[in-house]
Regions:
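Catalytic core of non-heme Fe(II) oxygenases with the double-stranded beta-helix
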Residues: 111-189, 195
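Catalytic core of Fe(II)/2-oxoglutarate
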Residues: 176-231
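Short, structured patches in soluble enzyme cores that scaffold and shape functional sites
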Residues: 97-99, 131-134, 142, 204, ...
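N-terminal auxiliary "cap/dimerization" subdomain that precedes the catalytic jelly-roll/cupin core
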Residues: 1-90
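Short helix/loop capping segments that flank catalytic or ligand/cofactor-binding pockets
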Residues: 43, 140-142, 210-211
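Solvent-exposed alpha-helices and their adjacent loops that cap or buttress functional pockets
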Residues: 24-25, 122-124, 221
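Extracellular-facing segments of soluble proteins and assemblies that are Gly/Ser/Thr-biased and enriched
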Residues: 70-120
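Short, surface-exposed beta-edge/turn micro-motifs
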Residues: 28-31, 126-129, 197, 225-226
Length: 231
């Protein structure tokens, strides 16, 4: 399958949902992409949904009440099918109309919001699934092109000052505040934009994980809402 992800060692490309959920992550591959060119007017759906807050969860019932053109109906069917596939798989997908995420501006030397390069963590075996139907799309980055922020000396020193407790409790402090999940891109790093319409499965940091978790970030919105499926 020829596409812009084919030669990327971090990304495995599949042609079906079954392949997406059954293919194992291995070596440096910690992101799987069900590559799709979707036919439908997702912008029409966004224009007819009501943004109630910065992140508005859209229910199936809300989708079904929209009066749409033929292209809009096609887009809705794709979304409903994706939601059903993931639900049948045992996931808990959420469709979000998104203006922006909350920013973490508490400290000037480290941020723990989703606009920062980060990994997801879970106490049980799971993966992150996401698909952007409209708007700016997320990025991923190879693990060897980032540095864990807590290992950067000047950041680590400031975190130790912030901790102000016994050295033996410092690592727990980092985990409890999610500082250890965040990364900084190295100079000349080459992030990969996930694009529109593809359904992605990203590796999560959990006890049974065989590969490094996928480092990713939310995009800065371009003044328009995003329509995002995530679980």
């Amino acid at each position: 399958m020829s596409n812009r992800f084919s030669d990327n060692k971090q990304v495995g490309v599949v042609a079906t949902f079954a392949e997406l959920v059954n293919t194992h992550f291995q070596e440096s591959t910690n992101a799987l992409c069900w590559h799709r060119n979707l036919d439908g007017d997702f912008e029409e759906i966004v224009s007819k949904l009501q943004l109630k807050e910065n992140i508005t969860e859209v229910s199936t019932d809300e989708l079904l009440t929209l009066q749409l053109s033929e292209k809009g109906i096609a887009a809705r069917e794709i979304i409903l099918n994706d939601l059903q596939l993931l639900t049948d798989f045992g996931a808990s997908p959420s469709l979000n109309l998104l203006k922006c995420y909350e920013r973490d501006e508490e400290f000037d030397f480290i941020s723990t919001d989703v606009y920062s390069w980060h990994v997801d963590r879970s106490p049980v075996g799971t993966d992150t699934f996401l698909c952007t139907y409209y708007g700016a799309a997320s990025d991923i980055i190879p693990n060897d092109e980032v540095l864990q922020k807590i290992l950067i000396p000047e950041i680590r020193e400031k975190l130790k000052e912030l901790h102000d407790g016994p050295e033996s409790e410092f690592e727990d402090f980092l985990k409890e505040n999610y500082f250890d999940l965040h990364y900084q891109a190295k100079p000349n790093a080459q992030p990969v934009n996930l694009g529109l319409g593809h359904l992605w499965r990203l590796a999560v940091d959990h006890p049974e994980q065989k590969v490094l978790p996928c480092v990713h970030r939310a995009p800065v919105e371009k003044g328009e809402c995003r329509l995002l499926l995530i679980c």
